[in-house]
């Protein structure tokens, strides 16, 4: 198995083999599949992200879900090792932030338990839902706070994504998204790592 460093390097090389037009076309397929998932359709609050040039493009999906009346929350990097979530209320709420990508400048969002579905990018994913990030740990800290659902059938079957735990708090369903070449046989992981409940890669 490749180490995390080796796998990140390999994925970066694969990304360089694709043009922006090719990545945008793949993104359309991937987000199209996401939009058809029952858990996305039924969700009240969805966490998404504003994509880097080498990530699955998400702005069209953000616009559509916002137009459908869903609450959209987006990450904002606030330090070298920390991000927070902000509410999205249209493109006027976006400004150029860290890494040169658009970030939200709306109201801070801290009710993590209210997030029904979180769509998470990554450098690589595997069939067990293991995720390899860029190495900064931004999403790892969020995932630790968001809770674990761990039942993949919830999303695919259309069963109530808005089910609550006995204590009244929600249980965020985590979907990893990536390009097909980022879906690998195995991602280095340990028992303490957060796993995705589903991975959508366009295959």
Q: Where are the language model's segments positioned?
A:
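A structured binding-face within diverse protein domains that lines the active/interaction site
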Residues: 102-104, 121-124
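Active-site glycine-rich loop that binds ribose-phosphate moieties when present
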Residues: 138
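Surface-exposed, charge/polar-rich loops and edge strands
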Residues: 2, 13, 17, 113-118, ...
């Amino acid at each position: 198995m490749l180490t995390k460093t080796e796998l990140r390097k390999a994925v970066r090389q694969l990304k360089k083999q694709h043009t922006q037009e090719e990545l945008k076309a793949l993104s359309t397929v991937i987000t199209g599949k996401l939009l058809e998932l029952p858990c996305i359709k039924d969700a009240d609050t969805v966490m998404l992200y504003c994509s880097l040039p080498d990530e699955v493009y998400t702005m069209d999906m953000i616009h559509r879900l916002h137009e459908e009346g869903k609450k959209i929350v987006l990450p904002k990097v606030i330090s070298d090792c920390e991000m927070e979530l902000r509410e999205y209320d249209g493109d006027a709420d976006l400004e150029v932030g860290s890494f040169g990508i658009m970030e939200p400048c709306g109201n801070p969002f801290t009710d993590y338990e209210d997030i029904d579905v979180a769509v998470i990018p990554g450098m690589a994913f595997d069939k067990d839902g293991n995720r390899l990030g860029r190495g900064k740990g931004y999403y790892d800290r969020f995932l630790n706070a968001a809770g674990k659902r761990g039942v993949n059938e919830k999303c695919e079957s259309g069963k109530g994504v808005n089910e609550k735990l006995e204590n009244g708090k929600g249980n965020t369903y985590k979907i990893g998204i990536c390009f097909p070449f980022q879906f690998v046989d195995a991602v280095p992981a340990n028992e303490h790592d957060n796993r995705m409940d589903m991975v959508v890669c366009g295959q």
